[in-house]
Amino acid sequence: MPSIYINIFLAFILALLGMLVYRSHLMSSLLCLEGMMLSLFVLITLTALNTHFTLSFMFPIILLVFAACEAAVGLALLVMVSNTYGMDYVQNLNLLQC
């Protein structure tokens, strides 16, 4: 396994650990999620370039579309929660609270 794949895998694991450690604030969770998406994008792009399979060139674009949608929904949720409660704690996202 080349060292670039190991570095990308370590970046993904580091973002995942950050997601687990800093899960109390929504902004920290969104930043870690974006780090995971970035490492997946680089990994899929390198894999598409190495396989030379024509259909695999659209997978990084599809991942970027999903990452942009996820970021837009996450930021809208962050704005809504911070305007409603005045803080960005993830525990405010519980739908069972009145």
UniProtKB/Swiss-Prot annotation:
Its EC number is 7.1.1.2. It is a multi-pass membrane protein. It comes from Oryctolagus cuniculus. This is NADH-ubiquinone oxidoreductase chain 4L. It comes from the Eukaryota. Belongs to the complex I subunit 4L family. Keywords: Electron transport, Membrane, Mitochondrion, Mitochondrion inner membrane, NAD, Respiratory chain, Translocase, Transmembrane, Transmembrane helix, Transport, Ubiquinone. GO terms for biological process: ATP synthesis coupled electron transport. It is an enzyme of class 7 (translocase). It catalyses: a ubiquinone + NADH + 5 H(+)(in) = a ubiquinol + NAD(+) + 4 H(+)(out). Core subunit of respiratory chain NADH dehydrogenase (Complex I) which is composed of 45 different subunits. It is found in: Mitochondrion inner membrane. The chain crosses the membrane at residues 1-21, 29-49, 61-81. Its main location: mitochondrion. The gene is MT-ND4L. Pfam families: Oxidored_q2. One of its GO terms (molecular function) is NADH dehydrogenase (ubiquinone) activity. Core subunit of the mitochondrial membrane respiratory chain NADH dehydrogenase (Complex I) which catalyzes electron transfer from NADH through the respiratory chain, using ubiquinone as an electron acceptor. Part of the enzyme membrane arm which is embedded in the lipid bilayer and involved in proton translocation. One of its GO terms (cellular component) is mitochondrial inner membrane.
